[in-house]
């Protein structure tokens, strides 16, 4: 496993109702190398004030990373400190992952609720 090995980070919208329900993530996909930093942004459905983020590794079910409600962290899964988040006044949020590891290669999901 040389230093050129790529870590794939993919995103997929997850929300209530149809795909065009309004939850958006950016960027929609990324290719990063180990050791790099990544910021993933999530915009909730209009009127929703709660945003949750999940990681889904290949062959696994989604794992809860964190939930923000009214700009405060209300819950956190069993993830290391390299995973952090923030919710902005407009209720959009971001997930930051510092010093990417090969094991961080996964599908990252975002959901919003009232």
From Swiss-Prot:
PANTHER family, per database record: T CELL RECEPTOR BETA VARIABLE 5-5-RELATED, T-CELL RECEPTOR BETA CHAIN
Q: Which domain of life is it from?
A: Eukaryota
Keyword Phosphoprotein carried by entry: no
Tell where it localizes: Cell membrane
Q: Which residues are glycosylated?
A: 90
State the protein's purpose.
Probable non-functional open reading frame (ORF) of V region of the variable domain of T cell receptor (TR) beta chain. Non-functional ORF generally cannot participate in the synthesis of a productive T cell receptor (TR) chain due to altered V-(D)-J or switch recombination and/or splicing site (at mRNA level) and/or conserved amino acid change (protein level). Alpha-beta T cell receptors are antigen specific receptors which are essential to the immune response and are present on the cell surface of T lymphocytes.
The subunit field of the Swiss-Prot or TrEMBL record says: Alpha-beta TR is a heterodimer composed of an alpha and beta chain; disulfide-linked. The alpha-beta TR is associated with the transmembrane signaling CD3 coreceptor proteins to form the TR-CD3 (TcR or TCR). The assembly of alpha-beta TR heterodimers with CD3 occurs in the endoplasmic reticulum where a single alpha-beta TR heterodimer associates with one CD3D-CD3E heterodimer, one CD3G-CD3E heterodimer and one CD247 homodimer forming a stable octameric structure. CD3D-CD3E and CD3G-CD3E heterodimers preferentially associate with TR alpha and TR beta chains, respectively.
- Mind telling me what this protein is named? Probable non-functional T cell receptor beta variable 5-7
The Ig-like domain sits at 22-114
Identify the stretch annotated as signal peptide in this record.
1-21
UniProt organism field: Homo sapiens
Disulfide bridge partners, by residue number: 42-110
Keywords of this entry:
Adaptive immunity, Cell membrane, Disulfide bond, Glycoprotein, Immunity, Immunoglobulin domain, Membrane, Receptor, Signal, T cell receptor
User: Could you state one GO biological process linked to this protein?
Assistant: adaptive immune response
Q: Which InterPro entries match?
A: Ig-like_dom_sf (IPR036179), Ig-like_fold (IPR013783), Ig_V-set (IPR013106), TCR_beta_variable (IPR050413)
A cellular component term from Gene Ontology for this protein is:
plasma membrane
């Amino acid at each position: 496993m040389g230093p050129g090995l790529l870590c794939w980070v993919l995103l997929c919208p997850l929300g209530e109702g149809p795909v065009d329900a309004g939850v958006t993530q950016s960027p929609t996909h990324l290719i990063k190398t180990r050791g790099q930093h990544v910021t993933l942004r999530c915009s909730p459905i209009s009127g929703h004030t709660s945003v949750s983020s999940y990681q889904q590794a290949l062959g696994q079910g989604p794992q809860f990373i964190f939930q923000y409600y009214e700009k405060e962290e209300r819950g956190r899964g069993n993830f290391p400190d390299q995973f952090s988040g923030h919710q902005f006044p407009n209720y959009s949020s971001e997930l930051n992952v510092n010093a990417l590891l090969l094991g961080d290669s996964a599908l990252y999901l975002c959901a919003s609720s009232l």
